[in-house]
Design a protein with these regions (language model features):
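Structural detector for internal amphipathic alpha-helices that build alpha-solenoid repeat scaffolds
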Residues: 214-241, 258-273, 291-315, 323, ...
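Conserved double-stranded beta-helix
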Residues: 144-163, 168, 173-272, 280
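Catalytic core of non-heme Fe(II) oxygenases with the double-stranded beta-helix
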Residues: 95-155
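Short, solvent-exposed loop/turn segments at secondary-structure junctions
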Residues: 26-28, 87-89, 104, 127-129, ...
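Non-heme Fe(II)-dependent double-stranded beta-helix
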Residues: 1-110
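A structural signal for short, well-ordered beta-strand segments
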Residues: 85, 120-122, 184-188
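Amphipathic alpha-helical scaffolding segments comprising HEAT/armadillo-like alpha-solenoid repeats
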Residues: 240-253, 272-293, 315-326, 345-359, ...
């Protein structure tokens, strides 16, 4: 049985972006993984995704009840391995890395605040502060600009596993020792939107968070509360009047990202009263920020602060966003698709409109619509046919997102099996690998044969 997190630990994850657990297997077990890892590096160098085939005992670490419990708590009971893993070697007397966010492999994902992706960092040997441990910046996982380097070092004995929100700022620190430091990094994804807490939750638990009175504060109380409610499978109730809407919409373009984020979630607090002015702001921001977003690395053109606000509004924003899927401007269509997917359960009835956008002339719209349909779930024929068709798209990251969406839909996506079987021969590794994962998730006899 997975050892689930309790409310306090889950709240800490929502706020800080990481949690540490221990796979308390025998020390000799971890020592053998360490020796096997060293042997792979000595004989073949860094084998990237093939490390599991070279060191199959790694699977037992991530199947440990403490690790499964934390991942279940954060990503839900249907979470899956993502087909990306990497062993990081920090050589003796090496310099520290720059603080960074990881890219999404072969994709330009939106950096959603809601935890649908997580990284796990595992040490097969003891790691102290002098050995170049990985560090994480607490409370920075919702920031796309580099925060102050108030980092926390992840140290611990063999078997220590740090699970982090995918968009956490992190780095390898300087290895001041004579000992090589190994860290196995694995990636996991959520396959089901939360409808209830997936951790050891008590209905009486009430998170203690500060009200966001100062838009420049790094205490993002409204944001944390919104993410917490999403994990609990509920939307928050609108609590503020609409008197500040205009000023807050202006603040979405402030120079300081903390101001933009706090303004977004203050607007989200206002519920339906904020939708019309936010949609106007979205139209402007989607065009105004387009050139910069396209030029930036690791950035989807729909990375918009009005988008975070509309996601936080939730259900009341769905009709207006569905209308924006018909915009003449592709960046607005792409943004609307992204936000509907981030809203999740409350936007499920927008699936037919999103399915129409799978045939959009603009690849960013197709990509965002495919991802959104994976979040919304449901295997309606038009959705599955559309996603299956995208597996032959000219653009790799469109095909990739179609395969991931079909993985999330799972058994209801059986109609896409022939297209998924063909995708097993795709030139792109992550398309092939995710097609195999989708076939496994479908679980039909024909899917098993394809695997």
């Amino acid at each position: 049985m997975p050892n689930l997190m309790d409310d306090a630990a889950m709240w800490d994850f929502v706020v800080d972006g990481y949690t540490v657990v221990h796979a308390d297997l025998a020390r000799e077990f971890h020592a053998q993984i360490h020796r096997d890892t060293e042997a792979v590096f000595a004989e073949r160098g860094n084998v990237g995704n093939a490390i599991l085939a070279e060191v199959p005992a790694l699977a037992e670490v991530f199947d440990h009840s403490a690790v499964r419990g934390a991942l279940t708590s954060i990503l839900g009971p249907g979470y899956r391995f993502y087909p990306h893993r990497h062993c990081h070697l920090n050589t003796p007397h090496s310099a520290a890395q720059a603080m960074h966010l990881d890219s999404y492999e072969a994709d330009e994902n939106n950096r959603h605040h809601r935890a649908r992706w997580a990284l796990a960092f595992y040490y097969p040997h003891d790691v102290d502060e002098g050995m170049g441990p990985t560090s994480v910046v607490p409370r920075a996982q919702y920031h796309s600009t580099r925060p102050p380097d108030d980092e926390t070092l992840f140290t611990g004995e063999a078997g220590s596993v740090c699970i982090v929100h995918y968009d956490s700022w992190h780095r390898a620190t300087a290895n001041l020792s004579d000992t090589p430091r190994y860290m196995h990094k694995w990636l996991f994804i959520r396959t089901e939107e939360p409808r209830e807490p997936s951790w050891d939750h008590s209905p009486s638990f009430a998170p203690d968070y500060p009200a966001t009175a100062d838009l420049g504060s790094r205490d993002h109380g409204d944001m944390w509360a919104n993410v917490w409610n999403w994990h609990c499978g509920r939307e928050w109730e609108a609590k503020e009047d609409g008197g500040r809407v205009a000023d807050l919409c202006v603040a979405l373009s402030a120079d300081l990202e903390t101001v933009r984020l706090n303004a977004a979630y203050a607007l989200g607090r206002m519920g339906g009263r904020a939708v019309a002015p936010l949609v106007d702001t979205l139209r402007d921001e989607a065009e105004r920020r387009l050139e910069g977003n396209l030029a930036a690395s690791m950035t989807n053109p729909s990375h918009l602060y009005s988008g975070y606000a509309l996601s936080a509004v939730g259900g009341p924003a769905v009709p207006a966003l569905t209308d924006e899927l018909e915009s003449d401007t592709w960046s607005i269509r792409a943004a609307a698709a992204n936000i509907l997917g981030d809203i999740g359960v409350a936007a499920e009835y927008a699936a037919p409109a999103l399915a129409k956008r799978l045939g959009d002339a603009e690849p960013w719209v197709r990509r965002n619509a495919a991802e959104a349909l994976g979040h919304l779930g449901g295997g309606a024929g038009e959705v599955v046919r559309g996603l299956g068709g995208l597996l032959a798209d000219d653009v790799e990251w469109v095909r990739l997102n179609a395969a991931v969406a079909l993985t999330r839909i799972g058994g209801e996506a059986a109609g896409a099996v022939p297209a998924l079987e063909s995708a097993l021969d795709d030139d792109a590794y992550y398309v092939r690998a995710n097609a195999a994962h989708a076939l496994d998730a479908i679980g039909s006899p024909s899917a098993g044969g394809a695997l």
